Amino acid sequence: MNSIQNLENSRSDHAQTIITKTTCPYCGVGCGVNIEVQHKTQGVAVQVAGDTEHPANFGRLCIKGSNLADTLGLETRVLNPMLGRKNHRSVTTWDVAIEKIADQFQSCIDQYGPESVAFYVSGQLLTEDYYVVNKFVKGYLGTANIDTNSRLCMSSAVAAHKRSFGEDIVPASYEDFEHADMVVLVGSNTAWCHPVLYQRIMQAKSQNPDLFVVVVDPRFTSTCEQADLHLPILPGQDVALFKGLLQYLYQHGYADHQFVESYTEGLQALLEANRTEQDFRAVVKRTGISAEKLQLLNTELD
């Protein structure tokens, strides 16, 4: 846990209670958490509560954050390599475990070739760790089958932010939801993946019934249930949708030309390149979104 701040340290003959402020380590909402630890004669008791003063969650926690205490003890943590399946595992040494893994890799490669094995590694490795594992997989085993959580999770966002804003930063705050007229969620089942943030959106909508919530997702998710408009887009056609929206907004006079001139580049070239293929009918055809729903989105943008 990072940036831990002790709030209370009360001592007695029987127990020492320490409450620390920290941040939930799971999703990107960054909820504040108060961890209460009691050091008793018979062990350590841990309780978790949302930080009511934290600007991200104001005391709210989702089920993952609420169960953080379950991850702090050593009772269910694997501390040694284990061999076996399900309830028939036994503790072994690192030497035996590494030899077992190597034998399995060698057997697959001998029988089916190096393309028969693959690695999926963490997004939290150090740069040096990434270098070593890539050398091992590509240079030694001879396969390109390696991927990380980073590519699916944040690398794409980093690239998009840098190209759009010049820096890997999100130029918005959660308070913006309370002042928004429209919220568009793209490919995000926010109700499940970021439930605390979703509650803030729904609270903003309850206070402002005119807030129009749009969900762009091939699936009908729990987030769609409370949305005003669900756009069941075909997979991989998000860019086509946004190019079409760009054309619509520009053609109907919604462009802030002073802002465009001062802070963007390449807009005219983009508009010209997509002038013929991104009209209303083309967007309907490519995205699979019905003309009625697409027109409703355009109308709400007006």
PLM regions and their residue ranges:
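Active-site phosphate/pyrophosphate-binding segments
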Residues: L245, S262-D302
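Short, solvent-exposed loop/beta-turn-alpha elements that line the ligand-binding surface or hinge
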Residues: H257-Q258
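N-terminal export/assembly segments and adjacent metallocofactor-ligating motifs
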Residues: M1-H252, G266-L270, S290-L294
